[in-house]
From Swiss-Prot:
Keywords: Disulfide bond, Glycoprotein, Glycosyltransferase, Golgi apparatus, Manganese, Membrane, Metal-binding, Signal-anchor, Transferase, Transmembrane, Transmembrane helix. It is found in: Golgi apparatus, Golgi stack membrane. The chain crosses the membrane at residues 16-36. Disulfide bonds join 97-139, 211-230. This is Beta-1,4-galactosyltransferase 2. Residues 37-372 are lumenal. The gene is B4GALT2. Responsible for the synthesis of complex-type N-linked oligosaccharides in many glycoproteins as well as the carbohydrate moieties of glycolipids. Can produce lactose. Mn(2+) binds at residues 218, 311. One of its GO terms (cellular component) is intracellular membrane-bounded organelle. Pathway: Protein modification; protein glycosylation. It catalyses: D-glucose + UDP-alpha-D-galactose = lactose + UDP + H(+); an N-acetyl-beta-D-glucosaminyl derivative + UDP-alpha-D-galactose = a beta-D-galactosyl-(1->4)-N-acetyl-beta-D-glucosaminyl derivative + UDP + H(+); N-acetyl-D-glucosamine + UDP-alpha-D-galactose = beta-D-galactosyl-(1->4)-N-acetyl-D-glucosamine + UDP + H(+). Weakly expressed in various tissues. Highest expression in prostate, testis, ovary, intestine, muscle, and in fetal brain. N-acetyl-D-glucosamine binds at residues 280-283, 323. The lineage of its organism: Eukaryota, Metazoa, Chordata, Craniata, Vertebrata.
């Protein structure tokens, strides 16, 4: 009996031992499996960073310095691919600038008696960038306008021009730049050739210019509704100057302030280069416009009023004795004399807070009468 009981007890002990061994083996297997999972988790954590491991939803609003993205595609290693360059914030699309700007004043009081230091003008126009560039902050203009001023020894006039014109052009919602083309030396002045130079040099700085306003430095508009824009036809702005009794002096007058699109300017081969001294070039330009089948566009005479800063005639800007003969021959000369034949040398380009000054050597006039 005792032998039978001992055998049974031995079998029970073996069975219990076998169960304990089996339980131990299962526990060991489960332990290593859990350890492997934890190891993989912490490996991903250290590779991606704590913000992505603990708060994956927050990565969608993280700064651009974070390279990972929650929706990035997985690489062969199982980790998200990092883009080579992260896109920056997209600038909002601005609406087109209105045809009739809402901030215009209308008739303006223009006077030239108060001193006008350049520092004051600069303080009054904080939105104008270096070089005289401006872009409206709240709309997209249809044109990019280059304002070209032929210049020599007129610093006093230029300060008044900048004082009045920058606020006007800004209210007109223009994207524009101001270029003062300064003739070097004391030889005879050549207004039209300087305007050709301004056209070319402005395009070198910004090929987007598609409208060109050519303005004498001593003329200021008396109404900001006289919009400095280009249209389907060449535009004459200064149609009623005070020196002419606020009347158009004659039907073909195109002087003072005018505007042409880039295409219109090239169509007439620019302006003549051979008008040295005062007078004649405006009539030649009018002839070029007429000969190419275009017409002059003008504002209402009540809006196209201008005040001129009074001054004596400039030294070395005497009347051109050949002007009447040249005007009669525009048809013969316009193809050879113009933007395609202008020769000059740029001596200095200086970007000032309110304008870009370009000093140029445009050569000397031929002797009168011409030789040969």
């Amino acid at each position: 009996m005792s032998r039978l009981l001992g055998g049974t007890l031995e079998r029970v002990c073996k069975a219990v031992l076998l169960l304990c061994l089996l339980h131990f083996l299962v526990a060991v297997i489960l332990y290593f499996d859990v350890y492997a999972q934890h190891l993989a988790f912490f490996s991903r954590f250290s590779a991606r960073g704590p913000a992505h491991a603990l708060h994956p939803a927050a990565s969608s609003s993280s700064s651009s310095s974070n390279c990972s993205r929650p929706n990035a595609t997985a690489s062969s290693s199982g980790l998200p691919e990092v883009p080579s360059a992260l896109p920056g914030p997209t600038a909002p699309t601005l609406p087109p600038c209105p045809d009739s700007p809402p901030g215009l004043v209308g008739r303006l009081l223009i006077e030239f008696t108060s001193p006008m230091p350049l520092e004051r003008v600069q303080r009054e126009n904080p939105g104008v960038l270096m070089g005289g560039r401006y872009t409206p902050p709240d709309c997209t203009p249809a044109q990019t306008v280059a304002v070209i001023i032929p210049f020599r020894h007129r610093e006093h006039h230029l300060r008044y021009w900048l004082h009045y014109l920058h606020p006007i052009l800004r209210r007109q919602r223009l994207r524009y730049g101001v270029y003062v083309i300064n003739q070097h030396g004391e030889d005879t002045f050549n207004r039209a050739k300087l305007l050709n130079v301004g056209f070319l040099e402005a395009l070198k700085e910004d090929a987007a210019y598609d409208c060109f306003i050519f303005s004498d430095v001593d003329l200021v508009p008396m109404d900001d509704r006289n919009l400095y824009r280009c249209g389907d036809q060449p535009r004459h702005f200064a149609i009623a100057m005070d020196k002419f009794g606020f009347r158009l002096p004659y039907a073909g007058y195109f002087g003072g302030v005018s505007g042409l699109s880039k295409a219109q300017f090239l169509r007439i081969n620019g302006f003549p280069n051979e008008y040295w001294g005062w007078g004649g070039e405006d009539d030649d330009i009018f002839n070029r416009i007429s000969l190419t089948g275009m017409k002059i566009s003008r504002p209402d005479i009540r809006i196209g009023r201008y005040r001129m800063i009074k001054h004596d005639r400039d030294k070395h800007n005497e009347p051109n004795p050949q002007r009447f003969t040249k005007i009669q021959n525009t048809k013969l000369t316009m193809k050879r004399d113009g933007i395609g034949s202008v020769r000059y040398q740029v001596l200095e380009v200086s970007r000032q807070p309110l304008f870009t000054n370009i000093t140029v050597d445009i050569g000397r006039p031929p002797s009168w009468p011409p030789r040969g």
